[in-house]
Amino acid sequence: VDHAAVTAPTAITGLKYNGKAQKLAAPGETLEGKIMYKVNDGEWKEEVPIAVNAGTYTVYYKAVRGEGHGETEEQHFDVNVSQKEIGIEWTNTEVIYDGTEKLPTAAAKGLAEGDTCNITVTGGQTEAGTYTAQAAAIDNANYKLPAETTVTFVIRKADFELTGMPQAKTDLVYDGKEQELITAGSAKSESEDR
């Protein structure tokens, strides 16, 4: 194959994951034969290579005349498909204290159709107060967290309403045994109303 008769394929730059197959190269041309491509350790093919997932791909190419009439030396270039940045939707950022650990919930926004992406949130707290939680990791390698990964959340003190006043017991007579001196009162927390 005459090298002068070959226009080499070129890497497509600026690719970002979108859930669809994207071409990794602008096709090359040859006046004699055809251009063959392979990606990483894949098979040689005539079709311009495509990829769906984020990552770095090594595209190899060569011009082949066919019928054993020669081919150019294989060349290669790298093409990067970058991760898509997700948005984060926070919920449960204001809760009532109940003695259990509280943590906001983070949901990924801006995903390609059919994709899922779970977010691991850290910074859970138990006591009433104001805290910061962080989206620490995601489980889909086609995406990346945004620059801002924290949220402020509040655990409010439970408000109690006295629903029954303790009362002193009257007419107690000594009988040598332990006796209750009052009737127990009762209280209801605001969280029980919800």
Question: Predicted regions span which residues?
Answer:
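Solvent-exposed beta-strand/loop surfaces, strongest in extracytoplasmic domains of secreted
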Residues: 1-194
